[in-house]
């Protein structure tokens, strides 16, 4: 309940700032599986500034749908700031009505983590 309330407050503040700047937002999500877009959409008035979202849970969708270079994933790792930024830029390029993008990539678990990137690791980008 506390997490839900905090997310609602953050989303409302985010929306107020977006409206003040006449901004429009698109999301690109991996480990959150649409949770960010869902939280934003639950905010009254979100239709004025939320353009939509991309859920790219699998690596292949990051490449195919958002244009994240395979070489970047190979060199930086799929859970990296560089890949999160590439996801955000890809979503923005494919959503011409958006002025900003929010992206996240990570390891949700319960398996799939490594010593370098344990379960619970996430990386975000806003462009």
Kindly give the residue locations of the regions a language model identified:
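Short alpha-helical segments enriched in small residues
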Residues: 1-127
């Amino acid at each position: 309940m506390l997490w839900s309330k905090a997310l609602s407050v953050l989303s409302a503040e985010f929306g107020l700032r977006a409206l003040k700047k006449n901004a429009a937002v698109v999301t690109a999500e991996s480990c959150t599986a649409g949770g960010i877009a869902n939280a934003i959409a639950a905010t009254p008035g979100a239709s004025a500034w939320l353009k939509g979202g991309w859920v790219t849970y699998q690596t292949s969708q990051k490449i195919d749908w958002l244009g994240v270079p395979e070489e970047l994933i190979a060199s930086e790792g799929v859970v990296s700031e560089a890949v999160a930024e590439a996801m955000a830029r890809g979503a923005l390029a494919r959503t011409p009505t958006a002025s900003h993008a929010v992206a996240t990539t990570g390891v949700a678990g319960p398996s799939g983590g490594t010593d370098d990137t344990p379960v619970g690791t996430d990386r975000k980008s806003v462009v």
